[in-house]
Structures are given as structure tokens and as C-alpha cells.
């Protein structure tokens, strides 16, 4: 078996990631949803999530061992999925399984999407709301629900004289962060990890953080999409970004070169209290060889000074919808449908997605996730706190995100102004939406 990574997070490596078996194996008898071994096709999955590459390789290898069906998993570099997908789909041996981020992504790829209406995997969904539709056709299946917020080192926070209960609003967060900065040399740590703006990290701010002003504008206007964002809460976006970059492990001018690995390693080394990231980071922080246990960490909402902050939850949703390439051969389509059904219905698949990938999956056979951050989200929801919806799937294009990211980077470096960020956000949105409408 050949296992590898096309390009990992922040990497420029280029090698095939494949899981194949030399001979056909019998299907396991241990589960009623065991995979079949007589499929004639093959599976090529273009994976979106670098942090789960190893787990997908292992699961693909297990499926191949069990069924004899070749499964190739290729993982795009962080921030390069759309570019990689365009390149791979132009090849004769194109992915049989790929993903889109929601309605905007689907608009670009719907002509390649097999109608999953009535498929076995669609029948496993716990709610039809996780089916991505175009008219009556189901063209995508949401396969993971995730949360993001401020991952917090409770031990460091307590060393600074505070607890999680002291932070219930942006004003509270600002007070704590600025106090930590004032005593940074004495304490030996910063408030925030570096807000890296290179391609392996900038999505945290041009997409995930940018979701907050979009969400609150949509809430205020009673909408769920727009061709003309107004930027009502961009002052709040500025406030939280300023807090990040002025109370972190490095000078703001250094952020253009800071990576996702830099930010994670700073947190792992207890150099900062807060780390904006998501539930997908759990296995990078807790477990064998990692410095933290569940008792050391939690996740807090990203407060920006808008709305009922005392009852605000984590940012929870999905931008991960599986699509099956309808241009693939019938055998490959059937093999791909069998594979994804096995992933979400078999003991092996659901356990791997819960334990190894840290996923909460919206399927009937889902295993309970041991992920601390998933549990925190569940607890907040049970307490009546309102999750912040993932509205960034309505962002008009990747080009829009890149424009906002470039403006944020220049602003942090002191070579650009916040007005440039506003222009990229508001005018850029209108321009990209107009291009979409004309396409």
C-alpha cells in the first residue's frame, strides 16, 4: 500500500496518497452494514481537510483490505482545495468523490454532481437539512458538524488570575487580554497565539472570523444570504482583530509569514492562553504525546460586542458536503456510493470518524465523539445558548476571501488601512456577487 499526502497544511510536497490492496478480501461479518467485496469500480476521494489526512488514509486502507475495492485519498493543501479540484477534475482519472462548501460552491460544480436523492447515504441523514439541494435534486451530503471559537488554556488563564467564568463578553475578553499583555514578561505568556496570515492560517480570519459580522448582519436584517453586504458590524470585526494582533506572541508586522503550525505550536508550548480554532484541532492538542488533557482546556465563544453575548454559543455548522462525480463510470459511482455509506454506517467507519477524526456526523449510526470541544458545544446548546451559524458558505467567492485576507495582512503590517479592509469586504462582495450573477 502506498500512503502519502498531495500537500499538507502549509506544505509544497506533491505525492500521491493512495490506499489499495493487492488482493480481494472478504467483507467483514461483524456488522450488518459491512461493505460488499464484489464492486468492480474504484474510489478517488479529494479530501478537503489536511488535519484528517492520516485518519482518512487509515480508513481507506481498512476499507480496501475488507472489500478489495481500491480507494485513493488525495488531500489538497490548506487553502488550495478549489484550485486542486479544478486541476484534478480536468484529468481523465478525476476524483469520484469531492466536496463543496455550500450553495456558493455548489453553483460552480453542480453540473458534475450525481443526484443522491434516494441513495442509501441520504437515507442515513438525521435531518434533511444536511442535504444540499438544487431544486428537487440532492447534490451534496453534509458529513460533519463542527464548532470553532477560542480554544482556551484554563491553566494559564488561572495563572493570570482569571477563570472562564470571568469572560462573558467582548469587554471582558478585552480586559483580560490587555491585562495579560501588560504583565506578559512577568507571566511568561501572551494572551493570543499569532494570527498567522499565510495560506495555512489566514482562513481563520478572512473566513471564520469574518463570519461573525456577516452572521450578525444577517440576523439584524432577517436574511440568510445577500448580493450586497452592508458591513454593519465591521467596526466589531476590527475590534476583535485588533485585540488578536496587539495582544499576541508576536509583532503584528510579522503576521504575513506566520503559519498555522506556528500558532498551534505556540499553544502547545503554553506561550498563549487563547487560540482561535475549531473542534477539528482536538486530536492535535490532547492525547498520547500531547501536553494537554481535557481538564486543561475549553472552548469559548468569539465575542465581538454584538447581540446577547451572555447567551452566545460557539460557531457551529458545516461547510463540508460530499459530492459524487456524475462523470465517473457507473462502476466507480457505485463503488463511491458504497464507500461513503460504509463510512457513516459501519462500526469501523463511524468509530474512525468520531475517535480518529474527532467528527460529529449527522447520520443515524453516529458514534459518540470523545472530543472535548464537541462536548462543550453540546453543553452550551443544552443551556439554551444560541450557536452562531456558519454563514461563510454564502461568501461570494474564494477571490473575495483572498481580497479580505490581503487587506487584513496589509493592515496588520501597517502598510494598509482599515478602510481598505472595509472596501475589500463590502465592494469586493458586490463585485464578486455580480460576477456570479453574470456567469
Please identify what each model-predicted range represents.
Residues 37, 101-151, 204, 208, ...:
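Hinge/lid segment of periplasmic solute-binding proteins
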Residues 115-129, 192, 196-199, 214-239, ...:
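Short, solvent-exposed loop/beta-turn-alpha elements that line the ligand-binding surface or hinge
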Residues 61, 66, 160, 249, ...:
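Extracytoplasmic/periplasmic substrate-recognition and gating elements
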Residues 139-141, 148, 174-226, 272:
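Extracytoplasmic/periplasmic solute-binding protein
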Residues 158, 182, 348-350, 365-369, ...:
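Conserved C-terminal helix/tail region of periplasmic/extracytoplasmic solute-binding proteins
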Residues 88, 95-96, 122-157, 188-190, ...:
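A structural signal for short loop-to-beta-strand junctions that line the ligand-binding cleft
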Residues 62-127, 139-140, 155-161, 168, ...:
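Extracytoplasmic "Venus flytrap"/periplasmic binding protein-like
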Residues 177-178, 223-257:
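Glycine-centered hinge/linker elements that transmit conformational signals in sensory
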Amino acid at each position: 500500500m502506498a500512503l502519502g499526502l498531495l500537500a499538507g497544511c502549509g506544505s509544497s510536497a506533491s505525492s500521491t496518497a493512495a490506499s489499495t490492496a493487492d488482493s480481494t478480501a472478504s467483507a467483514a461479518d461483524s456488522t450488518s452494514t459491512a461493505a460488499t467485496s464484489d464492486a468492480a469500480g474504484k474510489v478517488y476521494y479529494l479530501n478537503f481537510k489536511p488535519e484528517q489526512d492520516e485518519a482518512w488514509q487509515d480508513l481507506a486502507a481498512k476499507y480496501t483490505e475488507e472489500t478489495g475495492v481500491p480507494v485513493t485519498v488525495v488531500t489538497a493543501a490548506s487553502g488550495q482545495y478549489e484550485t486542486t479540484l479544478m486541476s484534478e477534475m480536468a484529468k481523465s482519472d478525476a476524483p469520484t468523490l469531492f466536496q463543496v462548501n455550500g450553495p456558493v460552491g455548489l453553483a460552480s460544480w453542480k453540473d458534475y454532481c450525481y443526484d443522491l436523492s434516494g441513495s442509501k447515504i441520504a437515507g442515513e441523514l438525521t435531518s434533511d437539512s444536511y442535504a444540499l439541494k438544487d431544486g428537487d435534486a440532492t447534490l451534496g451530503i453534509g458529513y460533519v458538524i463542527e464548532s470553532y471559537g477560542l480554544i482556551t488554556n484554563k491553566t494559564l488563564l488561572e495563572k493570570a488570575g482569571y477563570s472562564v467564568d470571568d469572560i462573558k463578553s467582548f469587554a471582558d475578553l478585552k480586559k483580560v487580554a490587555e491585562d495579560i499583555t501588560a504583565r506578559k514578561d512577568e507571566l511568561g505568556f501572551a494572551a493570543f497565539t499569532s494570527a498567522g496570515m499565510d495560506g495555512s492560517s489566514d482562513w481563520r480570519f478572512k473566513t471564520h472570523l469574518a463570519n461573525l459580522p456577516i452572521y450578525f448582519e444577517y440576523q439584524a436584517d432577517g436574511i440568510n444570504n445577500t448580493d450586497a453586504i452592508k458591513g454593519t458590524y465591521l467596526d466589531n470585526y476590527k475590534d476583535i482583530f485588533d485585540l488578536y494582533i496587539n495582544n499576541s506572541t508576536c509583532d503584528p508586522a510579522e503576521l504575513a509569514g506566520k503559519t498555522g503550525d506556528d500558532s498551534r505550536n505556540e499553544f502547545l508550548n503554553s506561550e498563549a492562553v487563547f487560540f482561535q480554532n475549531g473542534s477539528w484541532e482536538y486530536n492535535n492538542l490532547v492525547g498520547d504525546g500531547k501536553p494537554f488533557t481535557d481538564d486543561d482546556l475549553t472552548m469559548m465563544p468569539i465575542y465581538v460586542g454584538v447581540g446577547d453575548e451572555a447567551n452566545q454559543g460557539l460557531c457551529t455548522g458545516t461547510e463540508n458536503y460530499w459530492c459524487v462525480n456524475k462523470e465517473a463510470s457507473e462502476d466507480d459511482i457505485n463503488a463511491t456510493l458504497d464507500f461513503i455509506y460504509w463510512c457513516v454506517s459501519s462500526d469501523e467507519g463511524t468509530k474512525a470518524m468520531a475517535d480518529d477524526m474527532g467528527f460529529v456526523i449527522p447520520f443515524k449510526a453516529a458514534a459518540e465523539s470523545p472530543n472535548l470541544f464537541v462536548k462543550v458545544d453540546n453543553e452550551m446548546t443544552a443551556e439554551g445558548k444560541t450557536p452562531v451559524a456558519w454563514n461563510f458558505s454564502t461568501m461570494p467567492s474564494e477571490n473575495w476571501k483572498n481580497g479580505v485576507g490581503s487587506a487584513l495582512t496589509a493592515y496588520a503590517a501597517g502598510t494598509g488601512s482599515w478602510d481598505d479592509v472595509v472596501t475589500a469586504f463590502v465592494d469586493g462582495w458586490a463585485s464578486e456577487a455580480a460576477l456570479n450573477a453574470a456567469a
